[in-house]
Amino acid sequence: ILFIGNSFTVDATEHLPGMLKSAGITHVRMVRAYHGGYKLPEFFENYAAPDICTYYYCEPGATKWENEGTLNRSLKSIVESDTWDIVTLQEHTGSYYAWEWDETERGAISGLCDYIQQAQPLDRPTIGYIMAQAYGAYHSHYPKYFANQQAMFEAIVAQVRKITAQTCIDIVIPSGTSLQNLRTSSLNRDNGMDLTRASYHMDYGISRYAAAATVFRTLVTPCTGVSVEGNGYRYSTSSTSTTGYSTPVTDANAPVAIRAALEACRTPYAVTDMSKY
C-alpha cells in the first residue's frame, strides 16, 4: 500500500503497523510519500521534481515506520519503486481544497490517478481517498469559514461526494467520519481538545487509533478477511500538552475507537451517535 499525503496522512496511518502485527498480518508492505503541509495540486504539479517527498516505509511484519532521509525523493520515483495493490491520496485538511471543489482540485486528483495508472498500465492499483477531518470545536476557523464543526463536516462530505463522482477514485477511507463518531462518545472529555492536538491534528493516541482502524477496515480487511474488531494493539503514551495531546489506548477505550471506525465505514457520510459508549 502506498499512502501519498502530509501530516494528516501520518495521523491516519501511524498506528497501522502495530495493528497489522497484532492481527497476525505479516505480508503487507506499506510506504508513505510524505511532504508536510503539501496539497494535492502541489503533489501533481511537482510529480517528477526531485527532493519533494520523504520516503517512509514499513516492511512486512515490522511494528513501526522508518525513513531514509528527509525530502530526498520525487513522488514519481516512489510511485514507480514498487507494484502497488492500493494507492491512497489525501488532501491537506488545513486547505480549502479539502472542502471546496474546483477545477484545480479535480485536475490534480485526476492527474495523479493518471500518473499512478501510467506507472502500472497492466495492473492498475485500487486508488483510495482518505477523507479530511473537521477541526476541533474550539478552532479559530469557526465562525470565520464555517458556522460550526457540523457545517465543516458537511462541507467535507460534499467534497468527497464530488471527488467520487468526478474522478477515478475507487474507494473512500472515512477517517474524518470516524473522528466525528468518536467525538460523540464518552471519550471526548470536556478539556477543550475535542480529541485533537491544538484543535487541528488528531490526538496522538485514541483518535489516531480510530483512524488507523478505519484504514484497516477499508483497505486491509477486504484483502485479508481479517477483522479489526478485537485488535490487541495498544498505545501507552499519555500527554496533556496542547500540541502533543495523547490519550492512551487501553483495553477499555480501544473497542470504542474501533466501533467509531466500523460505524464510519458503514455510513461514511453521516455521524453515528455513540453517546452510549
Model-derived segments and their meaning:
Residues 1-2, 124:
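Short, surface-exposed connector motifs at secondary-structure boundaries
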Residues 49-68, 101-103, 118-124, 165-166, ...:
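Intrinsically disordered, low-complexity coil segments
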Residues 2-4, 33, 130:
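Short hydrophobic segments within beta-strands
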Residues 10-106:
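Conserved SGNH/GDSL esterase-like catalytic core that processes O-acyl groups on lipids
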Residues 194-195, 199-277:
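Conserved catalytic region of serine esterases and O-acyltransferases that act on ester linkages
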Residues 72-205, 217:
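Alpha-helical cap/lid subdomain in secreted, periplasmic
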Residues 7:
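Catalytic nucleophile serine of serine hydrolases
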